Regions:
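Conserved C-terminal helix/tail region of periplasmic/extracytoplasmic solute-binding proteins
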Residues: 337-378
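Short loop->beta-strand "edge-of-pocket" segments that line small-molecule binding or catalytic clefts
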Residues: 37, 172-192, 200-202
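Mature extracytoplasmic/periplasmic domains
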Residues: 279-345
Length: 378
């Protein structure tokens, strides 16, 4: 499918991060390092496109041939890896996932203060959502959001029709008795999208009712796949009818590949700002800082929109020509053009999630995974 460039509405584009000619006689900008390593759970569909575009920009601005590398792993796995590095990281950046884990790393002094210009920093609100606020940046400047996306339900409409199950309208619909063995999900200890969605269920229903709900979900689950990216893949292929706790842009990627797959953003779904942090002890801090500047520039925000994510600044809304991939992303998410209008309904409490992160994972292993029978009553 051919992709067409998006058109942004809103204020003029941010100058920071965009290429331009230097005035005659001006000194060239300080060069960046020639390598950049990113630790991330974000899909290669997003990461590789961003790194490729940033490398081209580095060549334009600094005449640097930048070598980039993404070390991909789920957010919980990446988090534990960063702790194990003990301030001598094998990457420069941690990008993507639940803000709670970034805040925890900041408290352990494993992140470094961001030097983002005030114009850019102030354009990003401190939080989004009500009655509980989802933080979009750290007041101490240890991390900042880069783009918004929602975690929801992926489903295969043809397979649902064959099973005699109506298309889902909210979370409870994944518990339909005819879906036994037909749901795919990732474990919360491997995926932050799954973990955050577990927290949405627990915090909206209370622990006792929430865990009973999650046990019923497990009874319908036919597969706990290795990574959250695999959830929409098996749904798109028709191996499973429904995917739980799925980032919207994963579904968008499958849609662009031509699969008949749909996405639902249920009420009270979690919206992540795809946090970005520079690791303490990073060997390439200048390249890391400039990559962040690029992501938060108009050029970077446009790239996010072309790949099914949403701007982290209210000044931008997702708009594109009819039939463009940008408009397809709007259609996929039920007409959303900005997560700032109307306001997001959110029950996820970041502090609660951070305080019991390991507790939720351990209880899942003990109460659900240990007795799971593949959703088929075996």
């Amino acid at each position: 499918m051919m992709r067409r460039r998006a058109f942004l509405r809103g204020a003029a584009g941010l100058a920071y991060g965009l290429a331009g000619r230097r005035p005659a006689g001006a000194q060239p900008p300080s060069a960046i390092e020639d390598e950049l390593v990113v630790q991330t759970p974000v899909s290669a569909f997003i990461v590789e496109a961003m790194l490729k575009e940033f490398a081209a920009y580095a060549k334009e601005r600094w005449q640097v041939t930048l070598k980039t590398r993404a070390q991909r792993a789920g957010t919980p796995v990446s988090y534990e890896r960063i702790i194990a590095w003990k301030g001598q990281p094998e990457a420069d950046i941690f990008w993507g996932g639940e803000p709670a884990l970034f805040q925890s790393l900041a408290e352990q002094k494993l992140l470094t203060r961001l030097e983002t210009p005030a114009e850019t920093w102030d354009a990003i609100p401190g939080s989004i959502g009500a009655p509980k606020a989802i933080p979009l940046k750290d007041p101490g400047r240890q991390w900042v959001g880069t783009a918004l996306e929602v975690y929801g339900i992926a489903y295969n409409p043809r397979l649902l029709k064959r099973l005699g199950v109506p298309e889902p309208r909210d979370w409870d619909d994944v518990l339909h008795p005819k879906l036994k063995g037909s749901v795919a999900q990732c474990t919360p200890y491997r995926s932050s999208s799954s973990h955050a969605t577990y927290e949405v269920i627990l915090q909206s229903r209370g622990e006792a009712e929430g865990w009973e709900w999650l046990k019923r979900l497990a009874a319908n689950t036919g597969a706990f796949v290795a990574a959250s990216r695999d959830v929409p893949a098996v749904v798109a292929k028709g191996e499973y009818a429904v995917g739980f706790g799925v980032p919207s842009y994963f579904v968008f990627e499958e849609k662009l590949a031509g699969f008949d797959i749909k996405f639902l953003a249920p009420k009270r779904a979690f919206v992540t700002p795809e946090p970005f942090a520079i690791l303490a002890g990073a060997r390439r801090p200048r390249a890391a800082r400039e990559f962040l500047g690029f992501l938060l520039s108009e050029r970077g925000q446009r790239l996010f929109m072309e790949r099914g994510l949403f701007p982290v600044m209210p000044r931008y809304k997702v708009h594109g020509p009819p039939g463009s991939t940008v408009e397809l992303a709007v259609q996929l998410t039920g007409g959303i053009r900005s997560f700032f209008e109307p306001p997001v309904t959110n029950v996820y409490d970041d502090e609660v999630a951070r305080a019991r992160f390991r507790e939720v994972n351990e209880r899942f292993k003990r109460d659900i995974e240990s007795s799971w029978s593949g959703g088929k009553g075996r």
